[in-house]
Amino acid sequence: MRITQVFLSVNDNSVYTEFVEPVVAQWHRVIPGVRVTLLWCDHRLPPHSWESIPGLDDVHVVVNVPDLVNIPTAITALWARYFFASLISAPGDVSIISDVDMFPLSRDYFVHQLEAVPSDTYAHLHANVPAYGRIPSCYHVASAANFRAVLGLEKGSWTESMLKVWASRKHADGWFCDEDFATCQMQASRHTFYMPSRRHQFDRIDRDLYYDVEMLSLGAYYDLHAPRPYHEHAAKIQSILQAVPGETRPALGHDILAYRVL
């Protein structure tokens, strides 16, 4: 299995939109040749300037039809990644969904560990976080057919799908409803999943931007969950990205491939 397409999404919120260009660039550094599709979920059109962002292959405008008028665009942006990963693909594509403020750091994590995983597998690279209480949106990895089969998206339109997810919400504002719905669908599925355990609890750089210099030089961190807004932290974020090794494999290694049915 090799990731060929990345799905990101935003609404018209500068706190998130300013991440688009640097995050797209970082995905191309980690997975050379990957296609990046940005889902724009808002009542307004996306900025024309995005047409010239290097490496941004497609800006897909998700039309918020009248039936969805009472659902915040931030929530439609969350679920859009799952739905359109099941719809927009070329033959042989394997897609990953991610947050627009997540910077991938490790080629070992996003490329090499998947090399032995069959392409018909549904993978999740960050599922083993019991305290979180649900399977995070980052990082589902699958073909379009498997996104449809596992998440129950074989039938129905974008509108029907979004209304179903919104109806299942556990919080009034709808936050986490995409993850809660996807978690229930995965638990009900009899599909085979690849869900590796985290190597240790300090294998990512979080919003406080704390990291160990030696671990960074070894390639031991797999992603950076960036603080917002980007412009206030850009220098520190870019210094971290520039210090990440290229093909260096981390000395920590991976757990045995974890194939299982939820």
Question: Positions of the model-derived regions?
Answer:
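GT-A fold catalytic core of metal-dependent nucleotide-sugar glycosyltransferases
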Residues: 77-125
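N-terminal anchoring/stem segment of glycosyltransferases
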Residues: 1-69, 255, 259-261
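A short, glycine-/small-residue-rich helix N-cap motif at loop->alpha-helix starts
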Residues: 16, 69-80
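Short His-Asn-centered micro-motif
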Residues: 8-12, 38-42, 75, 97-100, ...
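Catalytic core and acceptor-binding pocket of nucleotide-sugar-dependent glycosyltransferases
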Residues: 145-260
